[in-house]
Amino acid sequence: MILGLGIDIVEVSRLEKWLNDKKLLERFFNKEELEYVLSKRDGAAPSLAVRFAAKEAFGKALGTGLAGIELKDIAVANDKTGRPFLELFGTALQALKEKGGASIHLSLTHEKTTAAAVVIIEG
């Protein structure tokens, strides 16, 4: 049963500015996410933007927003085939449990100027 659906769209240029601010990046993204994003060179800004959109979409799918959730506790990872998925830790994992969520579906897309994410929480 679907418990929540969230979508978010981000302007890549907004997040491109963050690439020069290490403190800001470390506030919102975990080490593995940053290593992946920064390995993209020319694609770093869209990759960063789509990950931020995924975090925002997760908050919307919860129906409570991201209040009380550390954004570093929501991480976008990729399986062996490259399929993205959300890894939750700490405050984000607790929020999912409180919602009664058992699984999360994630879809990401980006172009040069925009990035979007859709999150579905099932219980």
UniProtKB/Swiss-Prot annotation:
SUPFAM superfamilies: 4'-phosphopantetheinyl transferase. Mg(2+) binds at D8, E56. The keyword Lipid metabolism applies. GO terms for molecular function: holo-[acyl-carrier-protein] synthase activity; magnesium ion binding. It is an enzyme of class 2 (transferase). One of its GO terms (biological process) is fatty acid biosynthetic process. It catalyses: apo-[ACP] + CoA = holo-[ACP] + adenosine 3',5'-bisphosphate + H(+). Belongs to the P-Pant transferase superfamily. AcpS family. This is Holo-[acyl-carrier-protein] synthase. It comes from Treponema denticola (strain ATCC 35405 / DSM 14222 / CIP 103919 / JCM 8153 / KCTC 15104).
